[in-house]
Structure formats: structure tokens, C-alpha cells
Amino acid sequence: MQKSTNSDTSVETLNSTRQGTGAVQMRIKNANSHHDRLSQSKSMILTDVGKVTEPISRHRRNHSQHILKDVIPPLEQLMVEKEGYLQKAKIADGGKKLRKNWSTSWIVLSSRRIEFYKESKQQALSNMKTGHKPESVDLCGAHIEWAKEKSSRKNVFQITTVSGNEFLLQSDIDFIILDWFHAIKNAIDRLPKDSSCPSRNLELFKIQRSSSTELLSHYDSDIKEQKPEHRKSLMFRLHHSASDTSDKNRVKSRLKKFITRRPSLKTLQEKGLIKDQIFGSHLHKVCERENSTVPWFVKQCIEAVEKRGLDVDGIYRVSGNLATIQKLRFIVNQEEKLNLDDSQWEDIHVVTGALKMFFRELPEPLFPYSFFEQFVEAIKKQDNNTRIEAVKSLVQKLPPPNRDTMKVLFGHLTKIVAKASKNLMSTQSLGIVFGPTLLRAENETGNMAIHMVYQNQIAELMLSEYSKIFGSEED
């Protein structure tokens, strides 16, 4: 290979020491020291003789490009924390409301984003490898909350992003949706709340890149081709584009200040602008507000059922009208005056449905998560008396709101069982209805079927041996 005497560059040719390969690496070195400070050396690879890969653009790069490489890890390095199928509906895009349209999506949760795929798991993973870009949600600054009023479906929560996008996620299986809710909430809580969030820096990086490096590259290539009289117009466009970028950054900065200065939920609650709800609140918080160990709403529902529902066929098994149940739930959450003898609550299945919903929506079930394994171990004991004593001992260790509410509820359910000849609700039937609602593991690990058996058995034991576990109802 020959060197040109008129060229400013020298070419070093390195032959591969392995036989059978024709790869030759060429380095372009700049002989001009001043020009070397303004440009970068690039490498070209010869894959076959006579074939050269297209050289990388040699425009100058600004300093921010090198800094952000360390600030923003590549997306491929994000760890997948959870994945699976959920029902998804996008109800807002950039603050603009959209028509709700439910669809099944394969959802992938990483450390700071959620990605939605329309395909099956295998297709989704294939597309991820081939560079397919799914719809994604940036969790930095996002907000997650239960959204029962947004849909007639059960187990619905909403994710709202800082960009104004809103998504609803849903599953009919309680423990699955709870697991997803806690996983996403934990991911959001781990992310920074200010502009140091990597995902926000990524957005800024995109704006800076589009307005600086790419523009400079475009200018650098065009300036050589166009005539001198056109250079002034190019410089004007360059200055005008930089001005637009400055305006965008100014607006972005103001929006960021506005968002970060919003009052916290705790502040709004202290001022009375936002009230704690009954549904979806922790049991001990509801009892603290009411200065009681048994929620007022639970006692109201039990009183109504015992007054006019003990003989009703399928009581607690038959579902009431969901719209009416949601209406009752709304009234209770607004702390409005409630009279369950009113004609609009005439269907007793609406009252029982609302009571089951109250227990189902507790962030932590009536049997606390920390006691789950202990109750399971107790129910596994072979001797019946030993089993009863073990369960009784655990019940006595429960926090007062849990223990007292449990006593009132199961005392009420024993009255249902006493009328089983009329309402056809046996101990086993009530165990199936209330077991998974009152008792569940914090994190299911594939033993859902086994856990369900234990959940039902524990609820049945609490009913059949009520007097031995809690004492007489009058105690």
C-alpha cells in the first residue's frame, strides 16, 4: 500500500496474525496539530479486501456528550424487576384525555420504567432483541394510586407520569394486582424526586443533542458544499435554532419548578383539603380516626345484614350490583351520613358486597402479613386441640384493631352459619368466600393453590371453633 506525499494524514496498516482472516485495521492520524485539537481520530475496519465500513461522522462534539455517558447508563443495562400479563388502558396522552380502551399487555418493569408489549411473551422478548421500541412509561416523578372510580372493573390502579400520560392497569386476581402495585410503587419511591433523575437527564440530553451536535454536523457538511453567499443564511438558522432551544429549556425549567413546589399529600391532608378515605386505608388508621378498634362501617353493615339478611339465600356468596356498591363506597369515603335502611340499599347483597370490598381493599389484610406463615403452620398441626390453641395464641398477639374486628366479623358469620338451612351458607362456603379476602401472603411465590387451601381452612376453623378461640360472643 502506497502513501500519498500530498496527504496530511498517514495510514498505519496492521495485518492480522491469524490465518484465514482478511481484517485490516487502519488508523487515520492528523499531522496538523491545530486541526487535531478540533477533530477526533476515527477507525475504519476492512472486513474484506476492498470493503471499507462507512466512517463515523467527524464533526466536533460538545462536552456534555462525554459527561452524560457517565450520568445515564444505557437502557440495555436496566434490570428487569417484574414481568407478566395485565389489562391496560391509556386514558390520557400529554394531559389530553383519551377514550378508555382495555387490552391485554405483556408488561415489563425495570428500575425506572415500564414497557408495554402487545405480543405474547416470546414475541415481546424477540422484539426486545431486534431493537423494537415498545410503548414505555418513565417512572421518574410518576404517581401511582388505586382508581376504583375510573372503571367498573375491580382491582384497578392508575399511573400518572410527569409528562401527563395516564395508564390504568387491572387484573381480576387480587394478589397479582397487589404484587404489581407494590412493585411499581417501590420502583417509583426509589427514584429521585428532583432534576437529578437519570430519566429526566436523558430527556435534556436528547434536546441538547438535537439542537447542538446534529445541527453542527449538518452545518459542517453543508458549509463545504454551498456557495459563500449562502453561509450567512446558515449562520442565521444556527443562531435561530439555538434561541429556540434556549426557550424550550426556559419553559422546561419553569414547569419543573412548578411541579416540585406542589404541596405534598401530607400538607393537603393537614389543611383538610384532602381527607383520608375509609376504603383503601390501613385498618389501624381508620380506627384511630374513629377512636375505636372496630370500624364504624363494618359495624353498620353487620347490623344491617343481621336485621334483614340472615335468611337470604346465598348471603355473602351472591354479588350485588357493582354500580350501587361503588355508590355506597363513594358516600362512605366522603363521610356523608349513611343510612343502610334507605330504599336505595334495599338489596342486601349490595351491603354484603361493600363489606367484602372494604376488607379486600385494605392495604394489609385483616390477618397481617407478618402473621401469615404462623397461621399456616398452626393450621398444619395434626391434633385438633393443638391446632385450636396455636390459632388462639396468634389471635391474642394481633394488634387490637385486627383482633377486635376479627372477633366481631367471625361472631357475625357464626350467625350466618346458624341459619344455613335457609341461606345455604355452610362453614365451608363462608371459608371459601372470606379466606382469600382476609388472609394472604405478602408475596406469592407460586404456591397460590396451596395457600388457598390453608386460607379456607383457617377461616373455617375460626368459625367452627369461634367460642374456643375468642371466648363467648358477649366477652
From Swiss-Prot:
Record keywords: Cytoplasm, GTPase activation, Membrane, Phosphoprotein
Main location: cytoplasm
Gene3D superfamilies: Pleckstrin-homology domain (PH domain)/Phosphotyrosine-binding domain (PTB), Rho GTPase activation protein
Membrane topology: Peripheral membrane protein
CDD domains named in the record: PH_ARHGAP9-like (cd13233), RhoGAP_ARHGAP27_15_12_9 (cd04403)
Location of the Rho-GAP domain: 281-470
Lineage top rank: taxon: Eukaryota
Record's compositionally biased regions (Polar residues): 1-22
UniProt function note: GTPase activator for the Rho-type GTPases by converting them to an inactive GDP-bound state. Has activity toward RAC1. Overexpression results in an increase in actin stress fibers and cell contraction.
Record text about domains: The PH domain is required for localization to the membrane.
Descriptive protein name: Rho GTPase-activating protein 15
Organism: Homo sapiens
